[in-house]
Amino acid sequence: MTAFKFWILYFEVTFYFDVFTKEILTCRIAARKGDRQQYIDGLEDVRELLKGHTEPVVLHTDQGSVYASVAYNELIKDTVIVRSMSRAGKPTDNPVNESINGWMKEELYIDFNISECRRKDEFEEVLASYVDFYNNHRPCYALGYDTPVNYRKRYYKGELERKNTFENRVLSEEPKFVQKRRKRAYSKDVSTFEKEDE
């Protein structure tokens, strides 16, 4: 989520972003500080986009209260989405989203004059124009100066090398920090609970 404040307007925008294609999959706007619905609606958009997909898709977020909520995580059940969360207070675990929010904001202010908006519908229109520009017209260095949408199309046509990053991975419901603690306790022949009490 990133916030925009100008004139008397305040908006929070949540972007869902594909790290592989660099495409903005969806974005949702809230006109109230702390509105949780934008996160839920955005995730529902992503679920709709993933209908018919069979390969796992990693959804990485920070540990914000919305992302950790039962309501948010219920939407992921029975989907191909695998959850990943940054460590608490570690924005460096999510550098892609942290940096993209910064330079997208800069482009919106400088190139799209978003600060001239005086109503929510104007803001939504400028944001939609930017997302279209970003996905369909803006060359991306990381994609060999291709656009995100064209890169995705080329990938699905088989023009780009396909890598299965999940091939040798075993997914577990148990968080890694719990696995490490359990392994440490077993290696010392002490139960996890006894170890924590010391």
Residue ranges and their predicted role:
Residues 1-25, 33:
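An active-site-proximal beta-strand-loop segment
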Residues 9, 28-52:
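Active-site beta-loop-alpha junctions of metal-dependent nucleic acid enzymes
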Residues 16, 22, 43, 59-62, ...:
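Mobile genetic element proteins and their domesticated derivatives, centered on retroelements
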Residues 23-27, 83-86, 110-112:
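Short small-residue beta-strand/loop micro-motif enriched in glycine and branched aliphatics
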Residues 23-25, 53-58:
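Short, surface-exposed connector motifs at secondary-structure boundaries
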Residues 46-49, 71, 75-79:
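Alpha-helical structural signal in soluble globular domains
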Residues 61-63, 69-72, 83-107, 119-122, ...:
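RNase H-like two-metal-ion nuclease catalytic core shared by retroviral integrases
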Residues 77, 81, 105-198:
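C-terminal domain-tail junction helix/linker
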